[in-house]
Amino acid sequence: MKLQLIAVGTKMPDWVTRGFEEYQRRFPRDMALELIEIPAGKRGKNADIARILQKEGDLMLAAVAKGNHIVSLDLPGKNWTTPELAEQLSKWQLDGRDVSLLIGGPEGLSPACKEAASQSWCLSALTLPHPLVRVLVAESLYRAWSINNNHPYHRE
C-alpha cells in the first residue's frame, strides 16, 4: 500500500524536509510514504484567493492516482485519537487501495478537494502552519503503523 501526501508548497525549510524524511524512511516497503509537492499560487495584496485555491486544488486532484482513497486534512474533519488512526490505517489496508492525503496551503483546500475526499481528518483544532502539518502527519501515520505492527515506537 502507498500513502501519498499531496501538499501545497515547495521549497520548505530544511527542518521540515528533514522531519518528514525521518518518518518517511522508517516505513517498510509495503507501506511506502510518498510526498508530492504542489506549487503554491502567488499570493499578494490583490491576489484572487478563490482562483488560487481552485488552481491548487486542480493540481492536487490531478496528482491523485486513479482509484486512490482520498482523505482531506481539514478542520471540519474527524478528530482521530492515535488508536483510532491506527484502526483507520488498518481499514485502508484492507480496502486494498492506495491512500492520498491532501494538505492545503495557507487558506486550506479548494471546495473541489473537499468534495473529492471520501474522508476528512482534522489533525488538530489548532491552526497549524501547513509545513508543520507534513511532519505531524508523517509521524502520526508512522505511529499508527507501529501500533498495528506491535513495534515498540508507540507507548501507552
Curated annotation (Swiss-Prot):
SUPFAM superfamilies: alpha/beta knot
GO cellular component terms given for this protein: cytoplasm
Compartments where found: Cytoplasm
EC code: 2.1.1.177
MF-aspect GO terms: rRNA (pseudouridine-N3-)-methyltransferase activity
Known catalytic reactions: pseudouridine(1915) in 23S rRNA + S-adenosyl-L-methionine = N(3)-methylpseudouridine(1915) in 23S rRNA + S-adenosyl-L-homocysteine + H(+)
Binding site for S-adenosyl-L-methionine: L73, G104, L123, S124, A125, L126, T127, L128
Domain of life: Bacteria
UniProt keyword annotations, A-Z: Cytoplasm, Methyltransferase, rRNA processing, S-adenosyl-L-methionine, Transferase
Broad EC category: transferase
InterPro entries documented for this protein: Alpha/beta_knot_MTases (IPR029028), RlmH-like (IPR003742), tRNA_m1G_MTases_N (IPR029026)
HAMAP family on file: 23SrRNA_methyltr_H
Physiological role: Specifically methylates the pseudouridine at position 1915 (m3Psi1915) in 23S rRNA.
Subunit structure: Homodimer.
UniProt family annotation: Belongs to the RNA methyltransferase RlmH family.
Name of protein: Ribosomal RNA large subunit methyltransferase H
Provenance organism: Shewanella denitrificans (strain OS217 / ATCC BAA-1090 / DSM 15013)
Gene from which the chain derives: rlmH
